[in-house]
Amino acid sequence: MAQNNFDFKFSQCFGDKADIVVTEADLITAVEFDYTGNYLATGDKGGRVVLFERSNSRHCEYKFLTEFQSHDAEFDYLKSLEIEEKINEIKWLRPTQRSHFLLSTNDKTIKLWKVYEKNIKLVSQNNLTEGVTFAKKGKPDNHNSRGGSVRAVLSLQSLKLPQLSQHDKIIAATPKRIYSNAHTYHINSISLNSDQETFLSADDLRINLWNLDIPDQSFNIVDIKPTNMEELTEVITSAEFHPQECNLFMYSSSKGTIKLCDMRQNSLCDNKTKTFEEYLDPINHNFFTEITSSISDIKFSPNGRYIASRDYLTVKIWDVNMDNKPLKTINIHEQLKERLSDTYENDAIFDKFEVNFSGDSSSVMTGSYNNNFMIYPNVVTSGDNDNGIVKTFDEHNAPNSNSNKNIHNSIQNKDSSSSGNSHKRRSNGRNTGMVGSSNSSRSSIAGGEGANSEDSGTEMNEIVLQADKTAFRNKRYGSLAQRSARNKDWGDDIDFKKNILHFSWHPRENSIAVAATNNLFIFSAL
């Protein structure tokens, strides 16, 4: 489905809409669409997983499916530490035999859940259905209190087998596998491999590889723990498998680097990696640089060609074939650059914002404060020759690199086949010209056909929407451009507690699910 309409409108909201005191256990900590987009899962700080099912194929509408307790609070007696029940991440597997499977994790334990429709049957007919008949005999022996004996009139011919009938259907969730006791530190990421047989889990210092069918054994593929912990200079912040090549995965660090690894080269992927890192002039370093440059989330584009990384102040788009600098750097909430001391005092500077690609690999979204989230339409475009580029305001951008080509031969070969189809699909009805001149490179990123309704003639390179109770009021708030401009105008009024950290983009259309404290908002361009 072409994803060239960016006229996002509010569709649904799940949760308490009134101004009530929000309990900490109700805060949503994970949001994830499945591969089809017909199912949506959320996890919260209380260890619960809530599933939603699409109820209307033409419009983006979902209904509640089921809820279950995925994790409970535990206590590590060896370390005297409490293990939170908070759901850190949820990942869907592909469905099999009318059952759905998903992985959920807290800080220490990963669980594989099977969600299926269960029939409840009751006994509708048996030998006592019609009751028991009694006969009264006149003989004095074997008599009852009323002077007669009691016997059931049941002949051999009248005996029946019990019959079951359909009573009800429920959605049941059962844990199929529990993967535990493999991480010393807190798990921050899980990622399912494209082979649908293995997945990885990452904590602060190690990354483990699991087989879905073997819960009691994992293989350590990355270990950055130094011999002397006083020499520790960085930690792992996120990890993800390549969406098409099952031998490739990447992980990010608190130093602002991304490392792409090939499991075919070595069993322990610590050293032989391709490192994506941007040079920072030491003159521009300050007290907060080390904190703000820490990458909180990384994502592959669905076609596997690009990488999006998010740190506190920027989103960076990388080409897997060019590791010396990003193709594009998008500045996020620039208003905070002069207020980093305030964010440090209230710990907001440590917030871990996510980043996400659209299903066609052309656009990205991320979150901010005041319940705002930003969508950047058509950041990645392609020409007829399938050489994808990133729209940028820097005319001197040169997306070429010859380093470490051996690790990406499989990606480049696949670009001409699988990626080529998606590139051609995206080129229909969209400006796909290569950025070659200063005029075109400085032009705003067009909003595609989404501008043909209220915002015709208005080109937008950033859409700012708000996941707040104002979204479902009856009052109209103007065009997309007007709403976006109003949401950008923060002034000095910033609510750091209203931060959009978790969200998911529908894989086949421009519909997004956004977690705002204890509410789940759905916006759609359909």
Curated annotation (Swiss-Prot):
One of its GO terms (biological process) is regulation of mitotic cell cycle spindle assembly checkpoint. The keyword Protein biosynthesis does not apply. Residues 390-458 are annotated as: Disordered. GO terms for cellular component: cellular bud neck; cellular bud tip; cytoplasm; cytosol; fungal-type vacuole membrane; mating projection tip; nucleus; protein phosphatase type 2A complex. It comes from the Eukaryota. Keywords: Cell cycle, Phosphoprotein, Repeat, WD repeat. Pfam families: WD40 (PF00400). GO terms for molecular function: protein phosphatase regulator activity. The keyword Cell cycle applies. InterPro entries: PP2A_PR55 (IPR000009), PP2A_PR55_CS (IPR018067), WD40/YVTN_repeat-like_dom_sf (IPR015943), WD40_repeat_dom_sf (IPR036322), WD40_rpt (IPR001680). PANTHER family: PROTEIN PHOSPHATASE PP2A REGULATORY SUBUNIT B. Present with 8600 molecules/cell in log phase SD medium. Belongs to the phosphatase 2A regulatory subunit B family. This is Protein phosphatase PP2A regulatory subunit B.
